Amino acid sequence: MSKIIGIDLGTTNSCVAVLEGGEPKVIPNPEGNRTTPSVVAFKNGERLVGEVAKRQAITNPNTIISIKRHMGTDYKVEIEGKKYTPQEISAIILQYLKSYAEDYLGEPVTRAVITVPAYFNDAQRQATKDAGRIAGLEVERIINEPTAAALAYGLDKEEDQTILVYDLGGGTFDVSILELGDGVFEVKATAGDNHLGGDDFDQVIIDYLVEQFKQEHGIDLSKDKMALQRLKDAAEKAKKELSGVTQTQISLPFISANETGPLHLETTLTRAKFEELSAHLVERTMGPVRQALQDAGLTPSDIDKVILVGGSTRIPAVQEAIKRELGKEPHKGVNPDEVVAIGAAIQGGVIAGEVKDVVLLDVTPLSLGIETMGGVFTKLIERNTTIPTSKSQIFTTAADNQTTVDIHVLQGERPMAADNKTLGRFQLTDIPPAPRGVPQIEVTFDIDANGIVHVRAKDLGTNKEQSITIKSSSGLSEEEIQRMIKEAEENAEADRKRKEAAELRNEADQLVFTTEKTLKEVEGKVDEAEVKKAQEAKDALKAALEKNDIDDIRKKKEALQEIVQQLSIKLYEQAAKQAQAQQQAGAGGAAKKDENVVDAEFEEVKDDK
């Protein structure tokens, strides 16, 4: 049975881990890094993922970053005349993680646990699951990021404790409060903001730099796509540097030009200025912290440990704010970039039966219910209910002789239906005509362990039932998923062929070089016709390389290899004959010499002292 890998599919960076001999291990990417940028680029029909995609982002407008922010929406990105959904772009990232996990493990990988922000709604979870399927992965479980972090932190902890996980990633923010004890990880409350993260901290620096430059030169850099990408890179770098130093230099030469010539952006950004620019963002994270404490019925003094997750928690102002709010130093014993993937790998081990005595009790982040008369949102399942769960309620008709009932399924906290997120709609038909208030319609909500919702409506009079697994308006149909799976497989095949072709060209180049070296060495030592034959085969391979015809390169390379091999054998045979001849000559000389040898006689003389 194949291994279950744990994937942290992040807004800015992604990470993959696996359980080896009961120990979670982060798998490095081909560049040797333990996290991979969640960046996809398209260049002349070729797909670039990760480090290479991020490196060329400045010059390539067909580069997609932070696609996770659009999961569960009907957003599409158009690249080279083709429209891609967020699920497809995420699948390209997942495919890449899957491929280097397979290289590391030396076996195919088909199963995964993928993490999502705790505050992701049903549509976003469904989209993540679909992305996994498109990438050729069976998603065994969707697990919340803070819960995964708690799992990684608490697996070897003996004592009972209450922990608060503060997870500030590239594009999302979550807070979860969990109780740990005897292998049980129970989420008590979760809160968050799906549109707050490190990207927003970068943005305040970008806005500041744009404003400074505008005041100085009267040019708006935000209108220039390439300048904006350079600003984004510089802002991210400055933000990271300010976590360790109190000021940093931002230098962007030739960022723009006017009638007098090129213009450069040179400025110093202090940590104090950055903290002033981002103070409102830091304060925004405190709202969900207070909300989670309130929902769990706890005070800051009840929290034993604060676990920091996500690269953005390295910002000193963030750590200070947590310390002020909760009255304790955050725990620094986990790597904020890797802890979520490690937790996902542990959950994979739990599912596969490798990890024993661990029970994970997660919660639904948002209340679920239906629209009832007057546009009111009637909750069936309250937020922070432990999942999996099921809840039923009986409703009735609003008009006489009503034969159909529209079930409008919603997720959210607002009292009016229109203000909440629509998850789906379906109809229960063929209700026997009766006065209003007589028919009894039972609506049942089921939430599975992935946090995905299934709804049933049943007319208790006729026992007629209608059910749906929620597919959001942005959800993909089975046909679309199958088409995308096929395309992803074809692209993976095309990528594999491209890699093979590059390797073949490198091998052919190397062979041309070694052949030229060999021909110089064998000059005058082997038959001239043999050398000429090798020379011609080498020139034919060179010509094939220039034409870039892969099949021809392969044929010519094999032909040249064969000739060079024969040459080498002949050269070796010749060298062996020469060595033999020399040996024989040496042996004969030694024999002649022996005839003239005279045995000497000697007498031992002892010195008397």
UniProtKB/Swiss-Prot annotation:
Residues 597-609 have a biased composition (Acidic residues). The modification Phosphothreonine is found at residue 172. It comes from the Bacteria. Keywords: ATP-binding, Chaperone, Nucleotide-binding, Phosphoprotein, Stress response. PANTHER family: HEAT SHOCK PROTEIN 70KDA. This is Chaperone protein DnaK. Belongs to the heat shock protein 70 family. GO terms for molecular function: ATP binding; ATP-dependent protein folding chaperone; unfolded protein binding. InterPro entries: ATPase_NBD (IPR043129), Chaperone_DnaK (IPR012725), Heat_shock_70_CS (IPR018181), HSP70_C_sf (IPR029048), HSP70_peptide-bd_sf (IPR029047), Hsp_70_fam (IPR013126). Acts as a chaperone. The keyword Chaperone applies. Induction: By stress conditions e.g. heat shock. Pfam families: HSP70. PROSITE patterns: HSP70_1, HSP70_2, HSP70_3. Residues 578-609 are annotated as: Disordered.
